[in-house]
Design a protein with these regions (language model features):
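PLP-dependent class I/II
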Residues: 1-287
Length: 287
């Protein structure tokens, strides 16, 4: 969905902006269109988009902005205030450069939000938005690549974008998911898996990490948490964690230095068993 959406709104030589940290596959998706991915530097520790830098980086060649909320790897949910200002910047820059800048919103974790909060819809803030969604997260169907692209009414080219993406899918060799999965998911539009387990797991990890002195932003959704590593080299920190049977992902993968991603899309008992290992890992850096 993301690859098709980007291809539909860009031409070779165009620029696509995204915010660090970001899902690493964005790079190949954009490169495959002949466009260039430019990455807005992160704004730690909150990891809300760095809108001051964003405003400065938008140029005449910018035709698309790619966002991900709730965010992988941080778990951060972009606030309504953030989305309002982002929309204002996009509107202003579109007028200045004489062409609309599209917003592609990657939202596979939309249903996984904590504290009873609702995730703001980026499309509600900016008209030229294409929304990408996947059922693999909310229905716990990892590996089943089934989702959609929704073009907001009023978006430039709304009459042709959907047809364009259907043809892009054919020409790039992307096949439809098996029909039995499509039919099954079609009957599950109003349900999700038990997503409360993710919030339980998040609270266990967040409480333990903060108690151990890690610098970490509390996730607002997803099933990831993104603490700062206890040394500058995140790769070295991940190798150290393996000595305690902890498998972490270094933040270099996501365009940021010095952090690690922990995934907690596992049963709660396994999360509980990991807590003593985190204690041992932290203790190893206090020696």
């Amino acid at each position: 969905a993301i690859a098709h959406a980007i291809r539909a709104v860009t031409q070779p030589g165009d620029e696509v902006l995204t915010f660090a940290p970001y899902f690493p596959e964005y790079g190949p998706y954009v490169a495959g269109t002949g466009a260039v991915l430019r990455v807005v530097p992160p704004q730690a520790p909150t990891f809300q988009p760095n809108l001051d830098a964003f405003e400065q980086m938008i140029g005449e060649k910018t035709t698309c902005v790619l966002i991900n909320t709730p965010n992988n790897p941080t778990g951060v949910v972009y606030s309504a205030q953030t989305l309002t200002r982002m929309a204002d910047i996009l509107t202003e820059k579109s007028k200045a450069f004489g062409h609309n800048i599209f917003l592609v919103s990657d939202e596979p974790y939309r249903d996984i939000a904590f504290d009873g909060k609702k995730v703001p819809y980026p499309a509600a803030f900016y008209p030229h938005t294409l929304t990408c969604f996947s059922y693999s997260k909310s229905l716990s169907l990892p590996g089943e690549r089934l989702g959609y692209v929704a073009v907001r009414p009023g978006c430039e080219g709304e009459d042709i974008l959907v047809d364009m993406m259907a043809q892009i899918s054919r020409f790039t060799g992307h096949n439809c998911p098996p029909s039995i999965i499509q039919r099954a998911v079609g009957r599950c539009q109003e349900v999700t898996s038990d997503l409360s387990v993710y919030e339980t797991n998040m609270n266990l990890l967040y409480d333990k990490l903060t108690a151990l002195g890690f610098e970490v932003e509390r996730p607002g959704g997803t099933f990831y948490i993104f603490p700062k590593a206890l040394e500058e080299d995140a790769n070295a920190f991940c190798l150290k964690a393996r000595e305690f049977d902890l498998l972490l992902v270094p933040s270099d993968t996501f365009g940021v230095k010095g952090y690690v991603r922990l995934a907690y899309c596992i049963d709660t008992e396994k999360v509980k068993r990991s807590l003593p290992a985190l204690e041992k890992l932290a203790a190893a850096y206090r020696k």
